[in-house]
Amino acid sequence: MFAPIIVKRRSKDEAEKPFWISYADRMTALMVLFLVVMSVALLAVTRTVSQIEQEKAQRQEDIAKLLDEVEQAADRYPGVKVDRDRDIIDFGDKAHFDKGRYSLNPDQDRLLRAFVPEVLAIARNDLGRKWLKQIVVEGFASPEGDYLYNLNLSLERSQRVLCTLFAPPYSDEKSMTPAELEQVRDLFLVGGYSFNATKYDAATRSYDESRRVELRLEFLGIGEARPPAPVLASGNFGKCALRG
């Protein structure tokens, strides 16, 4: 009357097969995930390092081109040289001072007022606007006398350079434009270094070369923002506070 009930028996292999993922399988999956994450992170770091190296190389290349332009300008003025290792414009004996003095002679005045506008033009080009941060007029003194006296004297020598640039030109000179003078005001700084970095001439047994000024070109670093220029009224540069 009743149909027989048939119970199907599972095979031995099927009965022993686990339902949940084993602990070893979980660890394997986590290890694979960890390796994938680490690979992605290492790839990102590698790309970042490579990008930084490319930016450094591009910066060095751009600055080298800028210094090439400054050298070309300096070549038109005998005695003016560019020290590429120190990013320095060296005027040689064209910007030497007498002992204990901070005044320049007329020929030195003319040289500065002729050469500096060429540097300003370079500062206005694409690479100059991109990398040139500021120009520091560095004054130096010979070791005769005490430190503080020479510190003040070296600062007066660097200040004299700016006074010369803002001074009325001689009748045979071309005047710097108001825009150029404003650029000098915004771009140039002065510094005095007393008798640090002295130069001794063994042949003449003198420190004449120590009594000098140099122009140091300072460049922006990678990612460094240019300091905002102060908002100042046009013109009205004032008068030189130095005597003579």
Regions found by a protein language model. Give the residues of each.
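Short terminal targeting/anchoring segments
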Residues: 1-78, 84
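Short beta-strand elements
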Residues: 73-86, 127-134, 184, 189
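Envelope-exposed proteins and targeting segments
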Residues: 85-87, 91-93, 100, 131-133, ...
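Periplasmic peptidoglycan-binding/anchoring modules of Gram-negative envelope and division proteins
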Residues: 97, 101-135, 166, 170-176, ...
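Short, cationic low-complexity segments
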Residues: 228-244
